[in-house]
Design a protein with these regions (language model features):
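Conserved nucleotide-sugar donor-binding catalytic segment
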Residues: 127-207
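Glycine-rich, basic loop-to-helix element that forms the pyrophosphate-binding segment
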Residues: 61-77
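A conserved acidic beta->alpha catalytic loop
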Residues: 25, 32, 40-49, 63, ...
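Acidic helix N-cap motif at the loop->helix transition within catalytic regions
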Residues: 17-20, 45-53
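Short loop->beta transition adjacent to catalytic acidic/histidine clusters or analogous donor-positioning motifs
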Residues: 3-7, 27-38, 46, 55-57
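Short aromatic/hydrophobic "clamp" motif used to bind/position activated sugar donors
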Residues: 82
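Conserved donor NDP-sugar-binding/catalytic core segment of glycosyltransferases
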Residues: 94-126
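N-proximal low-complexity "stem/linker" segments adjacent to membrane-targeting elements
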Residues: 1-25
């Protein structure tokens, strides 16, 4: 059996109320050559059961850290390219994987950041373009060549887990071991306003390069 083009990794923690929206945005993609890996981490609800409606590749862990859960997903991934979604976020249309496949096959880049949008209760919505505002360290805002990631992993520190992964890969590029390509297209909805979300706790939008 051939390996998938994409491995999509979703760390999930007690997200039964939100996970279906996330996973439906993946299942609704017109491009189907992918594997979906849900890492149900330290869950006390029926997150794993809900995930089972969408994929048979579910890994249950008890770390209580989204970075370590992502590491488990990376280790299990078989695809040529890696993508991450947080359990309460979603892709904004059904052609995201089609577009990402296009850029993966028409560039020689290893790390490809794309635009995302998030809500703000005072000012409506904001969007992030890495080329304009700096490289945001959020792992879900990029596509990664699996061979380029290699043994780079997230740390076990709650507040700096994403930094370890992002800066490890940026260092590789600065050493000439990989290439960027900035995608000026909007793909990702970052559900920052959901109380208790992974992204709200870790304030991804604060970290830029």
């Amino acid at each position: 059996m051939s390996k998938p083009f994409f491995s999509i990794i979703v760390p999930a923690h007690n997200s039964a109320a939100y996970l279906p929206v996330c996973l439906r945005s993946i299942k609704n993609q017109s491009f189907k050559d992918y594997e979906l890996i849900v890492v149900a981490d330290a869950c006390t609800d029926n997150t794993a059961k809900i995930a089972n409606w969408y994929t048979d590749k579910i890994i249950e862990t008890n770390y209580g850290r989204d970075g370590l859960a992502r590491n488990v997903g990376i280790d299990a991934a078989e695809g040529d390219w890696l993508l991450f979604l947080d359990d309460d976020d979603w892709w904004i249309h059904e052609y995201v994987l089609d577009r990402l496949c296009h850029f993966a096959t028409h560039t020689d880049a290893d790390l490809l950041p794309f635009q995302f949008i998030w809500p703000n209760d005072a000012h409506g919505r904001y969007y992030w373009d890495h080329a304009k505002y700096g490289i945001n360290i959020a792992p879900w805002s990029k596509m990664y060549r699996r061979s380029f990631v290699g043994d780079t992993r997230f740390s076990d520190a709650e507040r700096t887990s994403d930094e370890a992964f992002a800066y490890g890969l940026i260092d590789k590029i600065e050493r000439g071991e990989g290439k960027w390509f900035f995608i000026h297209e909007l793909y990702y909805y970052y559900n920052y306003m959901r109380p208790g979300s992974q992204t709200e706790v870790h304030s991804h939008e604060q970290g830029t390069v």
